[in-house]
Amino acid sequence: MPELPEVETTRRGLQVHLVGRTLQRVVVRQRQLRYPVPARVEAAVVGEEVVALERRAKYLLIRLGGGAWLLLHLGMSGSLRLVAETDAPGRHDHVDLVLNDGRAVRLTDPRRFGCLLLGDGDPQDHRLLRRLGPEPLGSAFDGAVLHRAARGRRVAVKALLMDATVVVGVGNIYANEALFRAGIRPDRAAGRIARARYDRLAGAVRAVLEAALAAGGTTLRDFTDGSGEPGYFAVNLSVYGASVCPVCGGALRQIRLAQRGTWFCPRCQR
């Protein structure tokens, strides 16, 4: 699944090509995504200038000059790529946002768990956005946020870290990596972790995500950035999918937490 670094990499790659352009038309080949593509989207955005391309959590927000906006999510296997308008679509190319320069932003989604929604007003009031927690790379996120959310809870700390109402964008790969950097077992009860350790964990989350952004995201199966290039952070993963601890040389343990593969070092993580 494209996680926060992958979505932000896509945003950065497309922003320079999209902002300031006009949407000439929208081509919808498949409406049945996670949520149906609105029937009025084609008529609503034609002739509108793109004034901003933003990200909130794992959602991309295309703001248009007339006040409307498009909200996109890449789902489990989706991507957005800049292509020539004349490029023949593939089987899983479901939507084209055609620009006034002969190019199009193409939504590809083999598993159809992504979405393209239309709205106006404040997008932060949308039902998909309004309950989201702070951005992990923003000033509102720190150890205090995690410590408050964990108070009195027996849930595993990894599950807390992946709860988008606590902090957004920390998916399975990066939760594994951040907990390793912070020296915290992923199955430890969240409410039994001291504030100082949460300070360390918040710093580890930031460091892991910043490193992934610098590398262009993590490619495991489907992710490509806005130009179709893969991300390269997978070569820098410390524990996710690995068998040997890079610090102590001991064997890593693999367990399942909340139905997700989880790796940790029983020596280095307590």
From Swiss-Prot:
Molecular function per GO: 8-oxo-7,8-dihydroguanine DNA N-glycosylase activity; class I DNA-(apurinic or apyrimidinic site) endonuclease activity; damaged DNA binding; zinc ion binding
Subunit structure: Monomer.
Function: Involved in base excision repair of DNA damaged by oxidation or by mutagenic agents. Acts as a DNA glycosylase that recognizes and removes damaged bases. Has a preference for oxidized purines, such as 7,8-dihydro-8-oxoguanine (8-oxoG). Has AP (apurinic/apyrimidinic) lyase activity and introduces nicks in the DNA strand. Cleaves the DNA backbone by beta-delta elimination to generate a single-strand break at the site of the removed base with both 3'- and 5'-phosphates.
Coiled-coil zones: none
Domain of life: Bacteria
Database matches in Pfam families: Fapy_DNA_glyco, H2TH, zf-FPG_IleRS
Cofactor: Zn(2+)
Catalytic function, reaction form: Hydrolysis of DNA containing ring-opened 7-methylguanine residues, releasing 2,6-diamino-4-hydroxy-5-(N-methyl)formamidopyrimidine; 2'-deoxyribonucleotide-(2'-deoxyribose 5'-phosphate)-2'-deoxyribonucleotide-DNA = a 3'-end 2'-deoxyribonucleotide-(2,3-dehydro-2,3-deoxyribose 5'-phosphate)-DNA + a 5'-end 5'-phospho-2'-deoxyribonucleoside-DNA + H(+)
Signal peptide range: none
Protein name: Formamidopyrimidine-DNA glycosylase
UniProt keyword annotation of Nucleus present: no
Residue numbers annotated as active site: 2 (schiff-base intermediate with dna), 3 (proton donor), 58 (proton donor), 260 (proton donor)
CDD domains noted in UniProt: EcFpg-like_N
Family: Belongs to the FPG family.
Zinc finger (FPG-type): 238-270
Entry's EC annotation: 3.2.2.23, 4.2.99.18
Listed GO biological process terms: base-excision repair
Organism of origin: Halorhodospira halophila (strain DSM 244 / SL1) (Ectothiorhodospira halophila (strain DSM 244 / SL1))
Cofactor binding notes: Binds 1 zinc ion per subunit.
Keywords, ordered alphabetically: DNA damage, DNA repair, DNA-binding, Glycosidase, Hydrolase, Lyase, Metal-binding, Multifunctional enzyme, Zinc, Zinc-finger
Residues where DNA binds: 92, 111, 153
